[in-house]
Amino acid sequence: MKIGIIGAINQETERLKKIIHFYIEKKINTYKIYIGKFKSHDVFLIKSGIGKVSASIATMILIDLYKPDTIINSGSAGSLQSFLKIGDIIIPKKTCYYDVDLTNFGYTRGQIPGYPKEFTVNEKICNFFKKNADKYQLKYIKGLILSGDTFVRENESIKILKKQFPSAIAVEMESSAIAQVCYKFNIPLIIIKSISDASDNNATVNFKENIDIVSYQLSKFVKIILENLIDM
């Protein structure tokens, strides 16, 4: 299989590079791509940069140049629920934008015209991890993840998001944009996130302190996915 992997920042991609064999580095404009192998898979790891547009461009680069069979987005997220702890893994069932509002035209908050109100992801890997939970002994939480072009870092912002999206459990800045592109081109998408902060007034400091822990947790899950992707 040909597998594209997207991480937003250095800490996320550096960990992932260590599980790719014999990679070479290529640069497309400002985007770094690491091309290598994982067992029989051809792997294309790209550092997208932060935010929705950067993530969309990175996704299109992978699709245009390498025609991946599956894309994996791995990265950090801020918690919207008190039961989530630093380093917890989120495998979302759905993702949507929190900063899109066309409700005056009859659309659901977060919905782009011509697209579903939420993007469904991870159906196969949710079933896989459910069946193999004892084998791998890795805990994860399922739920809705929100995306937008703001690093959420205020208690008041959390209240607003929870009111607008009661079922959301975490928030970040790339996954819905990647999901929109994959939806358009009918490419299966796997999203794995790990909690770096509580999206509160201490979020900036906590993110910096915890990003290495988060990246380590993510790399473990991504490796398991790569090892078992054909069987999912």
From Swiss-Prot:
A molecular-function term among this protein's GO annotations: methylthioadenosine nucleosidase activity
Pfam families: PNP_UDP_1
NCBIfam families named among the record's database cross-references: MTA_SAH-Nsdase, PRK05584.1
Record-listed substrate binding positions: 78, 152, 173-174
Lineage, broadest ranks: Bacteria, Pseudomonadati, Pseudomonadota, Gammaproteobacteria, Enterobacterales
Gene Ontology cellular component terms for the protein in this record: cytosol
Keyword Amino-acid biosynthesis in record: yes
The name this protein goes by in its record: 5'-methylthioadenosine/S-adenosylhomocysteine nucleosidase
GO biological process: L-methionine salvage from methylthioadenosine; L-methionine salvage from S-adenosylmethionine; purine deoxyribonucleoside catabolic process
UniProt keyword terms in alphabetical order: Amino-acid biosynthesis, Hydrolase, Methionine biosynthesis
Positions of the catalytic residues: 12, 197
Domain of life the protein comes from: Bacteria
Oligomer status and interactors: Homodimer.
PANTHER family: 5'-METHYLTHIOADENOSINE/S-ADENOSYLHOMOCYSTEINE NUCLEOSIDASE, 5'-METHYLTHIOADENOSINE_S-ADENOSYLHOMOCYSTEINE NUCLEOSIDASE
Reactions that this protein is recorded to catalyse: S-adenosyl-L-homocysteine + H2O = S-(5-deoxy-D-ribos-5-yl)-L-homocysteine + adenine; S-methyl-5'-thioadenosine + H2O = 5-(methylsulfanyl)-D-ribose + adenine; 5'-deoxyadenosine + H2O = 5-deoxy-D-ribose + adenine
UniProt function note: Catalyzes the irreversible cleavage of the glycosidic bond in both 5'-methylthioadenosine (MTA) and S-adenosylhomocysteine (SAH/AdoHcy) to adenine and the corresponding thioribose, 5'-methylthioribose and S-ribosylhomocysteine, respectively. Also cleaves 5'-deoxyadenosine, a toxic by-product of radical S-adenosylmethionine (SAM) enzymes, into 5-deoxyribose and adenine. Thus, is required for in vivo function of the radical SAM enzymes biotin synthase and lipoic acid synthase, that are inhibited by 5'-deoxyadenosine accumulation.
Pathway field: Amino-acid biosynthesis; L-methionine biosynthesis via salvage pathway; S-methyl-5-thio-alpha-D-ribose 1-phosphate from S-methyl-5'-thioadenosine (hydrolase route): step 1/2
Enzyme Commission number: 3.2.2.9
Family: Belongs to the PNP/UDP phosphorylase family. MtnN subfamily.
Gene giving rise to this polypeptide: mtnN
